[in-house]
């Protein structure tokens, strides 16, 4: 079968379209032989990090003492059918550890991240992982291509502090195809002495939440109804045609419309400092906390740069992650949105934060209730 681009579709292509990265892996291996031997890390302590489903982060320290560690993590690739809205629209999501987005990994500058990446034997496609936080080999993508039933181990050194995207990048059109099927997540590399403001004062958070913004491109049938498919990869030619239009059918937080609202809303208390980590692997976004602000915002996500202060809306470039710290001063339900309001309200890019505590009339009060206009 061919799509409008003349690309031939078959299971063989699905499993073998990553020739570019396979060739790159050969070049990387050859070049590595000529490089200096890696540092001796055999005596570094090893820590197994238990990854958790977003929006939560794994257990971690904000400030560390002592030297670097090897952070061991395991992720399992699973192709699974998920429902992305209340109308029952489905997609075969490509996931790390079964979630969209994949789990947050947390390390400190100078640590080593050692990933064991597994692909379930029941999967249909070839996958890999590209860490924007890493250095070399296409972010590790050239060294991690695996088929169903395989695993690979990759270790990289965290030399850049900040929050970074990771995603699948098997080659050619399969790169955007995998990314817009949910195969992305984020890494946070903290400075060893923690976050700081522009004057070097320590900044700490009481809780942190990972919001992964995802654009989906679901094909429709001749009646305009979203199509459903029996297996992973079956939608490839039709999805590519929709993707070429650059108009998503859904823009959601954490995998589905309403995934972070209602009884799944994020939680905080008045006085809490909350760190929001926002990642978008494919499109630009404009996070805004309705009723609040970004007290300290690392808009580009890089903690070596001083944070901006007091922002109303911040900008996340497609293919990056950013972080915003806010101290909640009033109770109530806050809406955290992509402030392209069409995408927030009509396509799904909205989360809620439920904040408990006492109301402060000095910050805001209703002076007069709604009533007839006075003469």
Can you annotate each of these PLM segments?
Residues 2-375:
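Copper-binding active sites and cupredoxin-like electron-transfer domains
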């Amino acid at each position: 079968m061919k799509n409008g681009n003349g690309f031939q579709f078959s299971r063989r292509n699905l499993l073998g379209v990553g020739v570019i990265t396979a060739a790159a892996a050969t070049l990387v291996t050859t070049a590595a032989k000529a490089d200096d031997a890696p540092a001796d890390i055999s005596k570094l302590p090893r820590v197994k990090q238990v990854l958790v489903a977003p929006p939560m982060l794994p257990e971690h320290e904000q400030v560390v003492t002592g030297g670097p560690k090897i952070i061991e993590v395991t992720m399992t690739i699973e192709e699974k059918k998920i429902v992305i809205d209340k109308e029952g629209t489905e997609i075969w999501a490509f996931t790390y550890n079964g979630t969209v987005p994949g789990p947050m990994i947390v390390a400190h500058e100078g640590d080593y991240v050692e990933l064991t990446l597994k692909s379930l034997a029941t999967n249909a496609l070839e996958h890999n992982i590209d860490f924007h936080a890493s250095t070399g080999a296409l972010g590790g993508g050239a060294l991690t291509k695996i088929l169903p039933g395989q695993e690979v181990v990759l270790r990289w050194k965290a030399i850049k502090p900040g929050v970074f995207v990771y995603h699948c990048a098997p080659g050619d059109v399969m790169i955007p195809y995998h990314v817009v099927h949910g195969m992305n997540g984020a890494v946070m590399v903290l400075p060893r002495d923690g976050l700081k403001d522009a004057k070097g004062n320590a900044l700490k958070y009481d809780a942190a939440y990972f919001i992964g913004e995802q654009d989906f491109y679901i094909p429709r049938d001749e009646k305009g109804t979203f199509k459903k498919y029996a297996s992973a990869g079956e939608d490839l030619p039709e999805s590519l045609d929709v993707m070429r239009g650059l108009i998503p059918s859904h823009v959601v937080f954490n995998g589905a419309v309403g995934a972070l609202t209602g009884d799944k809303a994020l939680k905080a208390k008045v006085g809490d400092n909350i760190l929001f980590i926002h990642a978008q692997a494919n499109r630009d976004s404009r996070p805004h906390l309705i009723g609040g602000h970004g007290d300290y915002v690392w808009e580009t996500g890089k903690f070596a740069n001083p944070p901006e202060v007091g922002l109303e809306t911040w900008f996340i470039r497609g293919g990056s992650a950013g972080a915003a710290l806010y101290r909640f001063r009033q109770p109530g339900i806050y809406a955290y949105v992509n402030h392209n309001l069409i995408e927030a309200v009509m396509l799904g890019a909205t989360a809620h934060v439920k904040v408990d505590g006492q109301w402060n009339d000095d910050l805001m009060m209703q002076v007069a209730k709604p009533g007839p206009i006075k003469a």
